[in-house]
Curated annotation (Swiss-Prot):
Main localization (coarse): cytoplasm
Organism: Photorhabdus laumondii subsp. laumondii (strain DSM 15139 / CIP 105565 / TT01) (Photorhabdus luminescens subsp. laumondii)
Function of the molecule: Functions in the N-end rule pathway of protein degradation where it conjugates Leu, Phe and, less efficiently, Met from aminoacyl-tRNAs to the N-termini of proteins containing an N-terminal arginine or lysine.
Record's keyword annotation contains Nucleotide-binding: no
Catalytic activity: N-terminal L-lysyl-[protein] + L-leucyl-tRNA(Leu) = N-terminal L-leucyl-L-lysyl-[protein] + tRNA(Leu) + H(+); N-terminal L-arginyl-[protein] + L-leucyl-tRNA(Leu) = N-terminal L-leucyl-L-arginyl-[protein] + tRNA(Leu) + H(+); L-phenylalanyl-tRNA(Phe) + an N-terminal L-alpha-aminoacyl-[protein] = an N-terminal L-phenylalanyl-L-alpha-aminoacyl-[protein] + tRNA(Phe)
Transmembrane annotation, as ranges: none
Keywords assigned by UniProt, alphabetized: Acyltransferase, Cytoplasm, Transferase
InterPro entries the record matches: Acyl_CoA_acyltransferase (IPR016181), Leu/Phe-tRNA_Trfase (IPR004616), Leu/Phe-tRNA_Trfase_C (IPR042203), Leu/Phe-tRNA_Trfase_N (IPR042221)
Subcellular location: Cytoplasm
Gene: aat
Stated name of the protein: Leucyl/phenylalanyl-tRNA--protein transferase
The EC number(s) this enzyme carries: 2.3.2.6
Length: 231
């Protein structure tokens, strides 16, 4: 078994994702901080943090990788009917900190501790992290957040407090992202929720090839301006 790399506090270098462990799947390195510079370096190499508040930062690059490829979004018949009469309206970058906070309150979001929240807040302030909000009667009832890397978007977490709210956030964002030149949506690890929307697994090596291809490209102007999205 290959040893876990301890990150150097004075360097933002990461080992190559191919050096990640197979068990636990994708564990690559430990330590470092959650500064915007380190997080940015990680995402540009296909690496993301995931750890409990009681742990040191753990850095991952799993194989396979879950993605949604343009044109492969799946919207079931029941959800399609819901979208035609949705009571929600959806925005971009109107309430980033609230979205992260609500994601952290989910049972599955217990890994989103204070350090994680502060780290992504810094990325948001530098224009690299973004949120999508779902509103109902002036209350946020769903949303998602993630990190933009060129024309690739790395989804981090989503939450829903009303029926289909997180799916509405994802679908509205998917169309918005593609209209602005988006080329790939990274879902990291496949789960039932993302699979129902059309996510599939691809080899990590293939994902890294996409990443290298897309990370230095630019989206069309205006993608991340505060705005209302259409479903």
């Amino acid at each position: 078994m290959m040893p876990i790399i301890q990150l150097n506090a004075d360097s933002y270098d990461f080992p190559h994702p191919k050096e990640a462990l197979t068990e636990p799947n994708g564990l690559l390195a430990v330590g470092g901080d959650l500064s915007a510079k380190r997080l940015n370096a990680a995402y540009h190499q296909g690496i993301f943090p995931w750890f409990l508040p009681s742990e040191m930062p753990l850095w991952w690059s799993p194989d396979p990788r879950a993605v949604i490829i343009p044109g492969e979004l799946h919207i079931g018949r029941t959800l399609r009917r819901f979208l035609r009469n949705t009571p929600y309206h959806i925005t971009v970058n109107h309430a980033f900190e609230q979205v992260v906070h609500f994601c952290a309150q989910r049972q599955e979001g217990t890994w989103i501790g204070k350090d994680i929240q502060q780290g992504y807040k810094k990325l948001y302030q530098t224009g690299q992290a973004h949120s999508v909000e779902v509103w109902h009667n002036e209350r946020i009832v769903g949303g998602l957040y993630g990190v933009s890397v060129g024309t690739l978007f790395c989804g981090e977490s989503m939450f829903s407090r009303m029926e289909n709210a997180s799916k509405c956030a994802f679908i509205a964002f998917y169309h918005h992202f593609l209209r602005h030149g988006g080329e790939l949506l990274d879902c990291q690890v496949l789960n039932h929720h993302t699979a129902s929307l059309g996510a599939k697994e691809i080899p990590r090596e293939e994902f890294i090839q996409y990443l290298y291809q897309f990370r230095n490209r630019s989206l069309k102007a205006g993608c991340w301006l505060q705005q209302v999205l259409e479903l």
